[in-house]
Amino acid sequence: MSRTNLFLLLLVFLAGTSCNKQQHFISDDAFRAEVEKDFQAKQAALPNGNLFSVFNQQMTPDEKEALTFLYAYMPIGDITDYDGQLYLDNIRSSFRARVEMPWGDSIPEDIFRHFVLPVRVNNENLDESRMVFYEELKDRVKDLSLYDAVLEVNHWCHEKVIYTPSDARTSSPLASVKTAYGRCGEESTFTVAALRSVGIPARQVY
């Protein structure tokens, strides 16, 4: 075999190996196995109903691993009270933001997993705010640095919701937009949801 043919054969082999190597949402093998174990325990604890039927849908390996992570660690009430499609839609929107926003590749995997991907912020009702907010915010922040994008999202939140004392219940992000007011916990929940919608890690701090 000539040296040229040997080189070409090596290139084909390497290309095939690269194509067959599965990309994981959770790159650490040990942690991925731990998540799967915890997910199976959650399934075993909730055997009745079709609470995990969303996993029967066609999805990418990344989407399935992200969904498995959410279900493994979300409160049981969030599994029983909400359709799984809500979580899958949120995952797909968060992945879209990671691809389309200029800072997406710079967010570490574990930070993205814990502070961008989750739907819940506090004790609010869950809604489709991530998808709604992304469509409204993406053009305002897509050409900004991460620092300036955080400021711009904060300005946008101020345009939408003002502070007003209320009761102890926490309104959902979309409900806060509808009423245009919220107490401190509601405003921070709203802001965290807005930041996460464009792929910026965020959480409440007390």
Indicate residue ranges for each PLM-predicted region.
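Surface-exposed patches in mature extracellular/periplasmic domains of secreted proteins
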Residues: 164-171, 203-206
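N-terminal accessory/pre-domain segments preceding catalytic cores
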Residues: 19-154, 166, 176, 197-198
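Bacterial Sec-dependent N-terminal signal peptides
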Residues: 1-26
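Conserved short loop/turn motifs at secondary-structure junctions
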Residues: 173-181
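Aromatic-lined, polymer-binding surfaces characteristic
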Residues: 162-164, 181
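Amphipathic, well-packed alpha-helical segments that form the structural scaffold of globular domains
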Residues: 154-158, 162
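Cysteine-centered nucleophilic/redox motifs
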Residues: 153, 180-205
